[in-house]
């Protein structure tokens, strides 16, 4: 095997090992997050709502407002909410 192939093999192995380490860290973090949700649930918090709040906080205000407007439009079309009063 040429030296170039050996270098490529070593680089590939290094990438794979880094990915494996990061995947393990990701699993550890996911387990930690699950534990926090469990702790919050034990204190009486609704974990579904907590997850929604976390997701909303990731979005900027404009994006949230656009999504809420579209949701309202869909709910209105399905008769699930009334039209907002026109002023």
From Swiss-Prot:
Membrane-spanning intervals of the chain: none
Molecular functions per Gene Ontology: DNA binding
InterPro entries associated with the record: GapR-like (IPR018753), GapR-like_DNA-bd (IPR046367)
Family: Belongs to the UPF0335 family.
Protein name in the entry: UPF0335 protein RHECIAT_CH0003797
């Amino acid at each position: 095997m040429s030296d170039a192939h050996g270098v490529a093999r070593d680089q590939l192995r290094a990438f794979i090992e880094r990915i494996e380490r990061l995947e393990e860290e990701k699993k550890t973090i996911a387990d930690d997050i699950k534990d926090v949700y469990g702790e919050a649930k034990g204190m009486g918090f609704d974990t579904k709502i907590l997850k929604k709040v976390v997701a909303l906080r990731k979005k900027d205000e404009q994006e949230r407002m656009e999504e809420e407007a579209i949701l309202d439009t869909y709910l209105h079309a399905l008769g699930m909410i009334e039209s907002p009063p026109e002023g």
